[in-house]
Regions:
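Conserved NAD+-utilizing ADP-ribose enzyme module
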Residues: 47-49, 60-224
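Extended catalytic/binding region for NAD+/ADP-ribose chemistry, centered on the ART fold
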Residues: 22-47
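Short, surface-exposed beta-edge/turn micro-motifs
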Residues: 2-3, 28-30, 50-51
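ADP-ribose/NAD+-binding catalytic cleft of ART/PARP-like enzymes
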Residues: 1-26, 224
Length: 224
């Protein structure tokens, strides 16, 4: 099965190179794509510079694909991977213990997969995750927050095998004048909606990370 993917960049990339990605991206080193052209356009530009949306097809037949949004996994699996690759601003002793607990209890060999599909931790999503780690929001609020802004899933090639299956099709120059405002608007909208979400009154049954640790809760205790 072939999937059409887009990658936003400052340049045209005809041959993605295995091993050249930044190790501190969400899921580690890899080639980060989306199925949404406009999202790729937003990723490609900054305030002062235009960019390129590169179009590819990926033959997924036989590839080992990790879909973090499938029922087999949970939001803490996504967060656990982020903890391995991104640097969080932890403001308390509790936050450090939270990281240790998630690393010890929600680990799995995600690097054995060829492709990872899941949320993209842009600036707003990343701040939501930090709030959860600092015990500021519940796990239910985190799940709702990650649907704000309509960022969709990113598709990340992480194995050499996956890189051998991607084929360049075309590229499109995209303007900062068009895509940077929509990029800013999407982030602002997500943050505004998050503030509205935070203003809602506390509900009985909400589970915070401190409770998860105190009760030594695991995946099966939280997601049934």
């Amino acid at each position: 099965m072939n999937e059409i993917l887009y990658h936003g960049s400052a340049r045209k990339i005809e041959k993605p190179k295995f091993g050249s990605g930044k190790p501190n991206n969400d899921y580690g080193s890899g080639f980060y794509c989306t199925k949404d052209f406009d999202l790729a356009g937003e990723w490609a530009v900054n305030l002062d510079n235009d960019g390129y949306v590169n179009e590819y097809t990926l033959d997924t037949d036989g590839l080992h694909i990790l879909n973090l949004n499938s029922s087999e996994y949970c939001i803490l699996d996504w967060l656990r991977i982020l903890l391995e690759n991104r640097r969080f601003d932890i403001q308390s002793d509790f936050g450090s213990e939270a990281i240790r607990y998630l690393r010890d209890n929600f680990s799995f060999d995600y690097r054995s997969f060829d492709v990872i599909k899941g949320y993209r931790a842009d600036d707003s999503y990343f701040s939501f995750a930090q709030d959860f780690l600092n015990n500021t929001i519940s796990i239910r609020t985190l799940e709702k927050a990650l649907l704000l802004g309509n960022l969709g899933d990113q598709v990340v090639l992480i194995s050499k095998r996956a890189f051998e299956r991607i084929i360049f099709k075309d590229y499109y120059r995209v303007s900062s004048a068009r895509y940077y405002p929509s990029k800013e608007m999407r982030d602002t909208k997500a943050r505004d909606e998050y503030r509205d979400l935070r203003r809602k009154p506390w509900s009985k049954g909400e589970i915070y990370l401190m409770q998860i640790i105190d009760r030594e809760m695991k995946r099966d205790d939280l997601f049934v």
